Regions:
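Beta-rich, blade/repeat-based domains predominating
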Residues: 53-68, 98-113, 144-166, 196-218, ...
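Beta-propeller domains
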Residues: 73-93
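Structural signal for beta-propeller blades
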Residues: 80-82, 124-126, 176-178, 227-229
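Short loop/turn segments that connect beta-strands within beta-propeller blades
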Residues: 86-88, 130-132, 182-184, 233-235
Length: 237
């Protein structure tokens, strides 16, 4: 499922989780609708409500939806880094206690098996796992690029995965490079980085694989400080 479709389907959930209790109390007898133009969303204030003492959430940076419609929430709360809901908001499972800087979450169908990619700011790593948390691959700071001298310089925020399994990591809180690996985690190339030219990025916070043009897929990268999206070919041009 691409990001645009997922966002449209789950915006109700995201806004609902973000609402302040005071807002909900004041309007509990009214419909709460957000959005503009033809993209409007009605809040379901009862969706996904859990006992905070048992299932705490710090920051929720991202959610994804698997092929069965389950919604997977990522938080940097190490009591339960992953919280999985069904479509109706009922808790299915939780797992994860080793991701204190959990930030980016990507789901990918790998030969019929869905896997997750977690960006951890504190660990300066990207971790690939099964849907139930078994670690399959860990990508450490990309020393092989020649751009990094220590792990602290690398603070990945997001990944996107190409159909062939190539992994693109956006170092959004680090040096703003996009690092490309093959499906085994072998380094291929890097591009972007900080600078003043059009090819450079400033806070490369998000990245996605855009295949709307099937013959010419591209990468779309956010350059947050420039208030811009930048398009790159799959080889970084």
């Amino acid at each position: 499922m691409n990001r645009r479709k997922f966002i449209e389907q789950t915006a109700t959930v995201t806004f609902g989780l973000a609402c302040m209790p005071s807002l909900l109390t004041a309007k509990q007898k009214q419909e709460i609708i957000f959005g503009h133009n033809n993209k409007r969303y009605r809040i379901d204030t009862k969706w996904g409500v859990l006992d905070f003492n048992r299932y705490p959430v710090k920051d929720c940076h991202e959610m994804v939806q698997d092929s069965k419609g389950r919604i997977i929430l990522l938080t940097n709360e190490t009591k339960n880094n992953i919280i999985t809901y069904d479509k109706k908001g009922k808790l299915i499972t939780t797992w994860g206690s080793e991701y204190p800087g959990a930030h980016g979450l990507t789901i990918f169908n790998e030969n019929g098996e869905e896997v997750l990619f977690i960006c951890d700011n504190n660990r300066h790593q990207v971790i690939k796992t099964t849907l139930d948390g078994r670690v399959l691959l860990t990508l450490n700071y990309p020393k092989e690029t020649g751009e990094y001298s220590k792990p602290d310089e690398y603070v990945p925020t997001e990944t996107t995965i190409a159909p062939n399994g190539d992994i693109y990591v956006a170092d959004g809180y680090g040096k703003d490079f996009i690092i490309q690996y093959d499906y085994k985690g072998t380094y291929i190339r890097h591009f972007g980085g900080r600078g003043t030219e059009e090819k450079h990025l400033k806070n490369a916070h998000g990245i996605c694989y855009d295949n709307r043009d099937k013959n010419n897929p591209v990468l779309i990268v956010t350059s947050r400080e420039q208030h811009a999206f930048k398009r790159y070919t799959l080889d970084g041009k």
